[in-house]
A protein has these predicted regions:
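Beta-strand-rich domains and repeat architectures in extracellular enzymes and scaffolds
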Residues: 12-59, 75-87
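A short beta-strand motif characteristic of beta-propeller blades
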Residues: 19-25, 65-76, 112-122, 167-171, ...
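Conserved beta-propeller blade repeats
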Residues: 27-37, 73-93, 120-141, 174-189, ...
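Non-catalytic accessory segments flanking enzyme active sites
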Residues: 28-35, 42-45, 66, 130, ...
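A flexible loop/linker signature enriched in serine peptidases of the S9 family
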Residues: 45-55, 74-80, 95-103, 119-128, ...
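Short loop/turn segments that connect beta-strands within beta-propeller blades
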Residues: 60-62, 107-110, 162-165, 211-215, ...
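Cap/lid segment of the alpha/beta-hydrolase catalytic domain
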Residues: 149, 197, 363-488, 495, ...
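Active-site-proximal cap/loop segments of hydrolase catalytic domains
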Residues: 444-560
Length: 560
C-alpha cells in the first residue's frame, strides 16, 4: 500500500496544516558573522525577545558563553546595511556597539570596555566602523570608517584605530571603501574602493600599498578592477600572496596576485562571490598555502570544495547544504552557515581531517516532520527577449492530504528583494506554510539576480520593473501551460524591491488574481529622493539618471 492511499482528497489551498501562522510569525533566530579563533567558534545570535539585539556567542569545547551581555548590541550601520561588526584575535573580542557606535574590547573572561579613555569617551560618536582587521605589528585596528558629523552624505575612509581610541586616516577621497586587509608580515595593505554611480557589484577597484614601520602608507597602486569589473573578498594567504574574487571573465572567480601578474585559479562558470550588500562575508579561506577551502554557487546552489592552487582542481567536500554563507577556515576545521530544502539555516563545524560535522546552533529548533516539507526543484523557463529565467518550484506537500483527481493547485509566485539578490532553496517556514496547505510556490531568480554570472546580473540594467516582472509573469504562465497549476488561481508576493515587482505585476499585467507587497517600493522618484548614500545612485543603473528619464520613473511606478 502506498503512502498516497492514506491521504484524503481536499481542495488545494485549504488543506489542514501543522505549520501555523504563529510558527511563521515567530520566525527564525538570526545567525550571522561567524568567526573561528583557533579552536573556538564565535557567532552573532539575534534575539527577538530583546528587541532584536545581536549578541556574540562563543563555543569553547562543549561550553557556550555569551560574550556581550545586554545592553550591548553587536551591530554597525556603515553603508546602512552594516555587517563586519566584530573581530576576534587570541580570545580578545573587539566589536561595534549599535547604540553609541563606539568600539569595545572584551578580553577573554572580562566585561567589554570602550576603546579610548579621553575626554568625551563616554558619549556616542558620529563615526561608524566596520570590517576591522588587526595590525599585530603596530597593535592597532584598521577599519572602514563612516563619519556622519557633517551635513549631507557621510564621509567614508579607511582608518587606523589605536587601543587608546586615537585615529589616523590611511585612505581617503573615494566614495566607498571595504575589506582593508593587511599582509601577514604587516608590510602591505590591500583594500577595495568604488565611486558613484557604481554599486560594488558593478565596478570596484582593488588597491595595494606599502606600510612603513610607523604605519603610514606609500606607493598605492591599482591591482585589479574598474568601472566594469567587480572585485571582492581580498585575502592574504599564509605566505603573503594576495588573493581576490573578480568577475572580469563574466563570473566571480578566484584570482591571485604574486606582485607581478594576476592568475585565475579555477576558471569556471560559477560564482565564488556574492553582491557586497554587507561587510564581513566570506566564501573562501586557506587551509594551507596551496589549499583553499571555498564555496561557490552553481545553478543557484552552493557547493563546498577544496581548491588546489597548483592544479586549479576542485575536490568536493561532503556536506548536506545547498546554501553556504560565512565560510571560515582554521587549519583543518571550518565553520559555516548552511541551509538546504529540509534544513533551516544553521551553524556547523566540519573537521576536514575526519569529515565529522557538528551543528553548533540552529535558526529554527522546532521543525515540522520531513513528510510535511515540500522539496523544491530547480527550473528554468523561457521569458521575454529570448531569455531564460531561473526559479525554485515547490509542489504542494502534506502528509495527510492530496489534490482531488484532476484538480490543480493554486500558485504563489515569490519575487525576492534587492533587486540584486538571490532566492535560495533553504527551508523557510513562510514558504512551507503555503505548500502544506496545497499551494504550489515558484520562488523566482529573475533576470538581475546574483548567482548566475555577470551577464544575468546585468540583465536588469535599465530594466527594473520590466525584466523582473516579465520573469515572474512568464513563470506563472509556464507552469499554467504545462498543466501544473490552476491558471485561475495565481497570486504573487514580494518585499522591498520584490514588492515593486509584485505591484508592477498586478498593475501592468493580467493573470494574477491577488498579491501582497511587503514594505514594497511604489514610487521610484520618492525612492530616489530618499535613498541613503550607499544606494543614492542605484536607480541610475536600474532605470536611468532621473534628470534624463523623469517620465520613465513615473511610468514604472505603480502608484501612478
Amino acid at each position: 500500500m502506498t503512502s498516497n492511499q492514506h491521504k484524503q482528497s481536499a481542495l488545494c489551498g485549504a488543506w489542514p496544516s501543522p505549520i501555523s501562522a504563529a510558527m511563521v510569525a515567530a520566525g527564525a533566530a538570526p545567525l550571522s558573522q561567524v568567526v573561528l579563533d583557533g579552536a573556538d567558534a564565535y557567532w552573532l545570535a539575534g534575539r527577538a525577545s530583546e528587541s532584536g539585539r545581536n549578541t556574540l556567542l562563543r563555543q569553547r569545547g562543549q561550553d557556550v558563553r555569551e560574550m556581550t551581555p545586554a545592553p550591548f548590541n553587536v551591530r554597525t550601520r556603515v553603508h546602512e546595511y552594516g555587517g563586519g561588526a566584530l573581530l576576534v584575535a587570541d580570545g580578545t573580542v573587539i566589536f561595534s556597539n549599535f547604540a553609541d557606535n563606539r568600539l569595545y574590547m572584551a578580553a577573554d573572561g572580562a566585561d567589554p570596555v570602550a576603546l579610548g579613555t579621553g575626554a568625551g569617551s563616554d558619549t556616542a560618536t558620529t563615526a561608524r566602523y566596520a570590517d576591522f582587521v588587526l595590525d599585530h605589528q603596530r597593535q592597532r585596528l584598521i577599519a572602514v570608517r563612516e563619519e556622519h558629523a557633517g551635513a549631507g552624505h557621510p564621509v567614508n575612509t579607511v582608518c587606523a584605530v589605536g587601543v587608546d581610541g586615537s585615529e589616523t586616516v590611511l585612505v581617503e577621497g573615494g566614495d566607498f571603501y571595504a575589506a582593508p586587509r593587511i599582509s601577514p608580515d604587516g608590510r602591505q595593505l590591500a583594500w577595495l574602493s568604488w565611486n558613484h554611480p557604481n554599486m560594488p557589484w558593478q565596478g570596484t577597484e582593488l588597491w595595494l600599498a606599502e606600510v612603513d614601520a610607523a604605519g603610514a602608507l606609500s606607493g598605492a597602486h591599482l591591482v585589479a578592477g574598474g568601472i566594469d569589473e567587480a572585485v571582492c573578498q581580498p585575502e592574504w594567504s599564509p605566505g603573503g600572496v594576495l588573493h581576490f574574487v573578480s568577475d572580469r571573465g563574466g563570473w566571480w572567480n578566484l584570482y591571485r596576485f604574486d606582485g607581478a601578474a594576476l592568475k585565475a585559479l579555477c576558471p569556471r562558470d560559477a560564482e565564488f562571490g556574492v553582491p557586497h550588500w554587507a561587510f564581513g562575508g566570506s566564501m573562501y579561506g586557506f587551509r594551507s598555502e596551496q589549499e583553499i577551502i571555498c564555496t561557490y554557487i552553481e545553478n543557484g546552489v552552493s557547493r563546498l570544495a577544496q581548491l588546489s592552487v597548483a592544479s586549479g582542481t576542485l575536490a568536493p567536500i561532503a556536506n548536506p547544504y545547498q546554501e553556504i554563507r560565512d565560510l571560515r577556515v582554521a587549519g583543518s576545521v571550518i565553520a559555516l552557515l548552511g541551509g538546504a530544502p529540509t534544513i533551516a539555516l544553521e551553524l556547523a563545524r566540519i573537521d576536514l581531517s575526519t569529515g565529522e560535522l557538528a551543528v553548533l546552533a540552529r535558526s529554527i529548533t522546532n521543525l515540522p516532520n520531513a513528510a510535511e516539507l515540500s522539496v523544491p526543484e530547480s527550473t528554468s523557463y523561457p521569458t521575454s527577449g529570448g531569455r531564460h529565467a531561473h526559479a525554485f518550484y515547490y509542489p504542494p506537500c502534506n502528509a495527510g492530504y492530496e489534490a482531488a483527481p484532476g484538480a490543480k493547485p493554486p500558485l504563489m509566485v515569490i519575487s525576492h528583494g534587492g533587486p540584486t539578490g538571490m532566492a535560495s532553496n533553504t527551508l523557510k517556514l513562510a514558504t512551507q506554510y503555503w505548500t502544506s496547505r496545497g499551494f504550489a510556490v515558484l520562488d523566482v531568480n529573475y533576470g538581475g539576480s546574483s548567482g548566475f554570472g555577470r551577464a544575468y546580473r546585468d540583465a536588469l540594467k535599465g530594466q527594473w520593473g520590466v525584466i523582473d516582472v516579465d520573469d515572474c509573469v512568464a513563470g506563472a504562465r509556464h507552469l499554467s501551460e504545462r498543466g501544473m497549476v490552476d491558471a485561475e488561481r495565481l497570486v504573487i508576493r514580494g518585499g522591498s524591491a520584490g514588492g515593486l515587482t509584485t505591484l508592477c505585476a498586478l498593475t501592468f499585467h493580467d493573470g494574477f488574481k491577488a498579491g501582497a507587497s511587503y514594505y514594497g517600493v511604489s514610487d521610484l522618484k520618492g525612492l530616489d529622493d530618499d535613498s541613503h548614500k550607499f544606494e543614492s545612485h542605484y536607480n541610475e543603473y536600474l532605470i536611468a539618471p532621473k534628470a534624463q528619464a523623469a517620465s520613465l520613473y513615473q511610468q514604472r511606478s505603480p502608484i501612478h
